[in-house]
Amino acid sequence: MQHPTPDALHARLAARRFILAGPCALEDFDVAMETAHAVREAAEAAGLFAVFKSSWDKANRTSITSFRGPGLVRGMEWLARIREESGLPVVTDIHLPEQAAPVAEVADIIQIPAFLCRQTDLLVAAAATGRVVNVKKGQFVAPWDMRPAVEKLRAAGNERILLTERGTSFGYNNLVVDYRSIPTMQGFGVPVVFDATHSVQLPGGLGGSSGGERRHVPVLARAAVAAGVDGVFLECHPDPDKALCDGPNSWPLDRLPALLKELSALWSLEHVC
């Protein structure tokens, strides 16, 4: 299956109306493949462009016993198969500079986790791959302080950049969304994504793991589209209550089509676009 070049992919993302969607972690190949096909079908029905997302290693879990994923080698094998069989581009994250090159052999978009958004060596390594790079804004970072991350990527020779808003720390075990961050970060000349599922997370809220309030996902996602966001990030799962990672804030896969149609309708409104 032919996939877009990095330049073509970034141009498509800059044209707005897209989603990055999939399970939090690659917990099971069949679940991931089922989700990828469902994401593609729901996105096509809503007239949206889709990218499959999932992590091969969740390095910043709350507990030492938390599920992390299949690891680099198996994770890349799974993502390569999903990419080929679903026809969707894929996005996945890296945590160390040396992971950039092997991940770039498979991933269309390399993602920098929120907690690592200031790590210069990581950003430079991701930029050096030539892939689209999605940097998630740290929960502790002001929107205007993401400009240096963009400048680091550009200084390393990469203009294919996305920034993602995923909520800001609001006291202990809670996040809040300031939608002013969307136009602020768009002002850096890059497309901006809104992470509707991590924004309803309650970090560490369950003691040994994070909680979440998935019932708020639709209203936060709609608000982001109304605020002019370019794309929406959604973690989804066939059975969120049984997911091995971020289940409390993941969106049920069978409810994805309806949500995407709502977002598509909002994107179509002239005053939003």
From Swiss-Prot:
Keyword Cytoplasm: yes
InterPro entries associated with the record: Aldolase_TIM, DAHP1/KDSA, KDO8P_synthase
Gene3D superfamilies from the UniProt entry: Aldolase class I
Annotated GO CC locations: cytoplasm
Family according to the record: Belongs to the KdsA family.
Alphabetical list of NCBIfam families matching this protein: KDO8P_synth (TIGR01362), PRK05198.1 (NF003543)
Protein name: 2-dehydro-3-deoxyphosphooctonate aldolase
Annotated source species: Nitratidesulfovibrio vulgaris (strain DP4)
